[in-house]
Amino acid sequence: MLYLYNTLTSRKEAFIPLEEPFVKMYTCGVTPYDKAHVGHLRTYLVTDLLRRILRFLGYYDIAVTNFTDIDDKIIKKSQELNKDWKEIVEENIKYVFDVLKELKVLPFYVYPRVTYHIDDIANAVKSLLDRGYAYKGKYSIYFDVDKYPYYGQLSGIKSKKEWEQEKHLLEDKKNPYDFALWKFKQPGEPYWNTIVGEGRPGWHIECSVMSSKYLGERFDIHLGGSDLIFPHHENEIAQSETLYNVHPWVRYWVHIGMVQINGEKMSKSLGNIIEAKEFIKKYKPEFVRFFLLSTHYRKPLDISEENIEQAQTIYKKLTDAYNTAKSIVENEVSYRFDKDVRIILDYYREMIKAFLDDMNTPTAIASLNKIVSIFNQNPEYPIAYLTLRAFEDFNRIMNVWFEKPIDLDIINEIIEIRNMLRREKQYELADKIRDILQKKGIKIKDYKDKTVWYADI
């Protein structure tokens, strides 16, 4: 059984979907005012990890992620660059899709965009107005937080804390902690003519409407960065539970730790933002997945040269063992029992248990490392077979080794020719063949009575 840490209850809980075997889940996506960065990658990859674990367990995931394609940040960027806001949005959404494809993130069920759901959002705002949960000000329509009794249940902020805002907005509200559902038309800003007037949606109502349109008025899992707990997710809950008359709106809230650069917060003001494509180009996509998933998802992830080098060492060791085990299994058969079999099975169970324990990837990696240590001491068929099975299930969940098509027959024939040259002691020619194969990504290991090859994936 899968256990997840639920921010809503502040504890680890057994995962039980509302409509088994289906799992409905929503991830807060990007606001495409700029290129996606490694922090966004981590959120997408943790979502991908959870979906692969659910599929491993036999569930059918229905996953949705959005694009907030109209927002204050987009308008500001458009003004700074003197560029149409729609162009900025389209460029940066394409950038996200390029990155997700490179990292082989599972496609989502739907990628809703705010501008495609303006009428849905306006209708939701009108419903809240009509039922007394919202009120009109001069600049916006606001949610009346005092009308919702459970405010603060997610963040633990019970004092109805306000956030930074301009004086004229404070004066426009009943209470400083009320938040905008709909922003009325302002000079020089995009707007839509709707049932609640000319304007555009507020930040929080967008996710409430889009998620429930595709997943229903109640669904299983909501994911996002830990920086969204307050006010975004707290406000989502308040408006959704009043809008749909449900409690709880979402059963499990999963929050992902922030990315740091050399121990410091990643931010534009510090100039240490790492763009997604830049990071993927420097380190191949498979390793990017491995590195960004190797720290427990709830903890901060620190990107530093030291941490990357440590991860590269582990990744290379695992990759070499995976390829060697694959080659042995493809080329040998044995019916011999080995005493290490039981130990490997224990470590395999430990690895799977770690994945199911709140996606504990560091422990899962450590368990696989224990299997590799046994295999490296005894690279024979029965151990190789079990090692390969462990790698295959690990990769079903982590997807950190992408398969590349290889013509096995041709490679095997070349290896046999090389072995013949070695038997005839034509070592110089045999070494030349080895070097040529290595340049093509085929690595060779010579043992006393056999040669094992594998693709350096």
UniProtKB/Swiss-Prot annotation:
Position of sequence motif 'KMSKS' region: 265-269
Subcellular location: Cytoplasm
Any matching Pfam family: tRNA-synt_1e
Family label: Belongs to the class-I aminoacyl-tRNA synthetase family.
InterPro entries per the UniProt record, alphabetical: Cys-tRNA-ligase, Cys-tRNA/MSH_ligase, Rossmann-like_a/b/a_fold, tRNA-synt_1_cat_dom, tRNAsynth_Ia_anticodon-bd
Species this protein is from: Nanoarchaeum equitans (strain Kin4-M)
Chief location: cytoplasm
Domain of life: Archaea
Catalytic activity, EC: 6.1.1.16
Presence of keyword Zinc: yes
Reaction catalyzed: tRNA(Cys) + L-cysteine + ATP = L-cysteinyl-tRNA(Cys) + AMP + diphosphate
Keywords, sorted A to Z: Aminoacyl-tRNA synthetase, ATP-binding, Cytoplasm, Ligase, Metal-binding, Nucleotide-binding, Protein biosynthesis, Zinc
Cofactor(s) the protein requires to work: Zn(2+)
Lineage, highest ranks first: Archaea, Nanobdellota, Candidatus Nanoarchaeia, Nanoarchaeales, Nanoarchaeaceae
Comment on bound cofactor: Binds 1 zinc ion per subunit.
One Gene Ontology molecular-function label: cysteine-tRNA ligase activity
Motif ('HIGH' region): 30-40
Record protein name field: Cysteine--tRNA ligase
SUPFAM superfamilies: Anticodon-binding domain of a subclass of class I aminoacyl-tRNA synthetases, Nucleotidylyl transferase
GO BP, one annotated term: cysteinyl-tRNA aminoacylation
